[in-house]
């Protein structure tokens, strides 16, 4: 991948997502960074699985959200900027109630903070 410069906008949670859906405000935020000179933008964490039901995290698993992701990518790409998706799973970490109903991880050992055992 070739970039127009070395400016990369790091991932950060904007909370511009509504009920796990990409919004116009989120798209405008990232497009503005591309117009301002960013050659690559790393998205905020994207929910990969249905058990990651955080209203402020864009849901990759939801087919109804595909149009929003497409509009988001097209808006950034139209400014000669690359949008890199940061997929996230909380893994075995499970410190907050409701944060990760089913802990997932490669180890059968419990999380050292919450003692949640991953599956």
Question: Where is each model-derived feature located?
Answer:
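Flavin-dependent oxidoreductase catalytic cores
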Residues: 1-119
């Amino acid at each position: 991948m070739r970039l127009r410069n070395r400016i990369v906008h790091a991932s950060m949670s904007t909370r511009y997502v509504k009920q796990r859906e990409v919004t116009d405000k989120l798209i405008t935020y990232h497009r503005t960074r591309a117009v301002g000179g960013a050659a690559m933008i790393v998205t905020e964490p994207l929910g990969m699985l249905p058990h990651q039901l955080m209203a402020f995290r864009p849901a990759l698993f939801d087919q109804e959200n595909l149009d929003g992701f497409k509009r988001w990518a097209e808006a950034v790409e139209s400014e000669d900027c690359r949008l890199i998706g940061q997929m996230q799973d909380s893994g075995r970490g499970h410190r907050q109630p409701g944060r990760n109903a089913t802990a997932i991880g490669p180890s059968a050992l419990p999380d050292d903070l919450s003692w949640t055992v991953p599956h």
